[in-house]
Amino acid sequence: MNIKQTLLLIFTYFISHTISAQCDLHFEFENTGSNMTVLFASSASQNIASVSSQGTIGAFYQNDDGDYICASAMNYHGSQTQLPLMADDSTTPEIDGFKAGDLIHWFYKDVSGSVYQIETSPADVFLLNSISIVQSVELSEVDCGITN
């Protein structure tokens, strides 16, 4: 196998791992006692409702293996909503929430099981005890190979 084939194989593996990680999301989290609050303003909520007004919004961080781990989730019903994003509990050895400066990865799963990646404006990083207001969002469906 030559270098180009090896690089193509490695690239394909990482792309497929990223896509499968986005499709295998678990929207459950533990309350760690410390958080950041994020409010989705009505303008952002309207964009989500244009896709589906029933589902779950989740905030995820990536672990060292590149897996997405939920640190907050909320049932969404088509209106303005806010979520507390859990911080890492420094009294435990495992990473169980966001650390300062972590990029926030947003996903939305509608009631039919379709998964969407959410790009927020402004784009945020985690900052303990802060409040962020998301003014607008763009959703792009993640191809999970699910047919409805």
Named regions from a protein language model:
Residues 7-10, 16-148:
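Primarily marks secretory-pathway-exposed extracellular/lumenal segments that are disulfide-
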Residues 1-7:
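Bacterial N-terminal signal peptides that target proteins for export
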